Amino acid sequence: MNESDALARCAEITRREARNFYYGLRLLPKSKRAALYAVYAWMRVIDDIADADGVDDNERSAGLARVEARTREVIARKAADDIARGADDIARGVDAIARGAGDGEQREDAVFQGLCAVLRDYPVHGGEFLAAIEGQRMDLAPRAYADYEQTELYCDRVAATVGRICLDVWGVKADVDVDIARELSTKRGVAFQLTNILRDIREDHARGRCYLPADELAANGITVDDLLAWSDATNADARCARFMHSQCARAQRIFAESAALDAMVSPDAVATIGAMSAIYREILRKIAVDPRRALARRVRLSALEKSWIALRARLGLLGERA
């Protein structure tokens, strides 16, 4: 299979599973796009293990342990400069998933082909993948997050890790301090995940999960059940509105604090980070405008809305909106 065919299949996987990220990732040059499709496929493996229905926590834990062991092996091979795979491993590996290589071992084999190539070809920090696994482990025994510090830790592990990996693949301009760029990338990833949390309150609650800071809920005299009841009732509840607006404001503030990141990435990644961020900012904006409705029904952008954002990003027309 030639490269263009493989990339087309990889793009289909990402389009189907990563409905928001796809619109930005497809704006990248082929090599970077293929690398991040492979990264997404790996992230999808651990996410699917943690969220698998009809599977007990012991089995989920064993699945994550298996992926961790294989990931550590790949990282060790990178450190020993022993990753000897062909230049088309990313496309071939992820393409195997698109062809329906099967669940379990076959699927993971395909993903790890891609991971080997990513770690070989880009200066990606292997520890980010291990931190992402720890983030999924936090979901194995759902619990209340006592305060924002705990919520932020979860966001860092499941989302900011991805942001930092993206930065390693995108690259930064020659005059940019990489450490500062990584700090801003962390903030952007946290803002993305806070948006996900606010979007998915009802869905997470059904899974026995709540990522909202418990102390802030208590300070407003409410529980998650109160939030869900508020969304279903006809009467207004100022406490719920106040809480939701404060959560949205925090996420918007963190987006704003990371605004300088967009000008730091390599020129060929500017449109991508712009599109991805604009899509998430628009989801957050819709939640903030009507949080009660957002609690009742998951906020989504249509394919047309996301395509329009991506087009504006490609043309450099998104502006500096935070």
Regions found by a protein language model. Give the residues of each.
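Catalytic cores of Mg2+-dependent Asp-rich isoprenoid enzymes
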Residues: 1-82, 89-193, 198, 202-322
